[in-house]
Amino acid sequence: MNLTLLLLALIFSPSLIFSLPTANKVKLVKKGLNWDYQNAKIHGVNLGGWFVLEPFITPSLFDIYSKPNDDSQVPVDEYHFTQKLGKDAAQQVLEQHWKTWYKENDFKMMLKYGLNAVRIPIGYWAFKLLDYDPYVQGQVKYLDRALDWARKYNLKVWIDLHGAPGSQNGFDNSGLRDSLGFQQGNNVNFTLEVLEIIGKKYGGPEYEDVVIGIELLNEPLGPSLDLNYLKEFFQQGYQNLRNSGSVQAVIIQDAFQPMGYWDNFLTLDQYWNVVVDHHHYQVFSAGELQRSIDDHITVACNWGWDAKKEYHWNVAGEWSAALTDCARWLNGVGRGARFSGDFDNSPYFGSCDCYVNIATWPSEYRTNVRRYIEAQLDAFEQTGGWFFWNWKCENAIEWDLQGLITAGVFPYPFYNRQFPNQCGF
């Protein structure tokens, strides 16, 4: 068969969706692939609450402003936290936090438990400030230290731009809650400049052995944004990283679009080493909370089946053990839980009292959480792997990988199954 006929056969082949990622891998090998997303599996964890504050992860930082049954004076995010403290006090408090929230021993324990990667969220303000920003800087020193620890303990890293100016989603984990100004003014261009800074430093040869992906932006709220403008941002962000010399994977988060939505975007041959990041949760609506455990597991299994069909390599960049939204401030400071009927006009499903502390979990709930975790692990093994959210939390056990492993709820080793073959893969 001559080359022209071969190319035509490939173009119209029904197996193209599977052959293209392989071609992508071959091209990457020639460019110096530092992670094989086609065959290797990420077993990773997020280091959330470190360089971008999240009240539900470290409520102790915010509790100084809390009163019994009154959160009205509590800052809702890092923007308002630093604004309330002022630059000098915020610098002092956050330096101590950056220095202590994750330490070298955490990385050592991650390796011990069988993890091979970490995803590190960080905000734009760590690299460049807007004139009016109350944020403080100093995070980069600790990010560099984290990369040294990751290298020492053979952990690969995704650097995840978790917050953009104006906020890309209005979530507290973007740094600025209840705002959606990412696509306004010069904010997109400013974000691209930040990505260029990240790419020039962490996409270079010094970090090729440890940084295997740079995420352009975490969880842009696609249903509320101009998706065409977002696609332009992704394209330019990709180009900025490649122009900086980076060969690492360029990660795009799915923007809350259905699986498969990005199949015809950033495709070969013009774009290479692109990975789609999916975040999977089932607790942020009343409809999800009312599902039976069997329904939860069916949904989780379908994530795996759907991921197998996608054009791009894909990874579950966030997921958790949560079957409730009972963790304090999970939905935001000043907001209750849907599960207990205290938020979002949700019906009452039950009291949160017994779900906050793992020691008081009903035995059936403990079993259900284990089943749910195992089903998700099975599903994400059909993809490029996973990053659990989060490595640790002060009081939110359903989101605390270290605590779940210690309690025997999360499989250890990860292939250990009490409920095998729930998905039938």
From Swiss-Prot:
Belongs to the glycosyl hydrolase 5 (cellulase A) family. This is Glucan 1,3-beta-glucosidase. InterPro entries: Glyco_hydro_5_CS, Glycoside_hydrolase_SF, Glycosyl_hydrolase_5. It comes from the Eukaryota. GO terms for cellular component: cell surface; extracellular region. GO terms for biological process: cell wall organization; glucan catabolic process. Coiled coil: none annotated. Its main location: secreted. Residues 1-19 form the signal peptide. It is found in: Secreted. The active site is at residues 219, 318. Disulfide bonds join 301-423, 326-352. GO terms for molecular function: glucan exo-1,3-beta-glucosidase activity. The keyword Nucleotide-binding does not apply. Its EC number is 3.2.1.58. The keyword Acyltransferase does not apply. Keywords: Cell wall biogenesis/degradation, Disulfide bond, Glycosidase, Hydrolase, Secreted, Signal, Zymogen. Beta-glucanases participate in the metabolism of beta-glucan, the main structural component of the cell wall. It could also function biosynthetically as a transglycosylase. It catalyses: Successive hydrolysis of beta-D-glucose units from the non-reducing ends of (1->3)-beta-D-glucans, releasing alpha-glucose.
